[in-house]
Amino acid sequence: MSNQEQLRSKMLSLADLGAQKVVNLVVQYASAESKPIDLLTYMSSGKRVPSLTEECITSIKALLQFLSTMPDSQNKSDHAFILALQSFAQVRAAYLTSSMEPMTRAVVNSANAVQRISVDAPREAHAEYRRGSAPFADWFKAMISTIQAEQEAATMLFQGMSWKNMYSSTISNILQPLLSSVHDQLPII
């Protein structure tokens, strides 16, 4: 291997290492604002469901833009860009599912309690239920609010960028775990 080839190889290795560090920065920025919250407290106090701040979105956007413009010398930089988007989506997905989990558990427990009533007639005729006593309405409002907030944040992140074509897969990766957990609970609810 000639000196020029060695130098080029070293330069590519440094670029890949730098790209990986930028991916880690994306994860750190997203993680800093993705600590699970008590959605019931937010919903009952009338506060808007929190989302990523504009400052965080702007910082992540700049990092992603940097990764998307790196030369495709070994195709690893393109991989780093996609990895950064996937990592961002994983962090936000974990935030959503962790934040919704206590309310989902309350809905499931309420549904289980109603279903435990053993009667000979159809459940609807004899199951005691007081309107508003089940946490379903609050859970549904929280679900819709979190999805809307996440969609707004993702829209801001992708707005005006050359990589807008990655929006649908990224938002899908963010919401899929939450929607899958709801789907898994539907037979109980």
For each of these PLM feature ranges, what is it?
Residues 1-189:
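Long alpha-helical rod scaffolds of large eukaryotic non-enzymatic complex subunits
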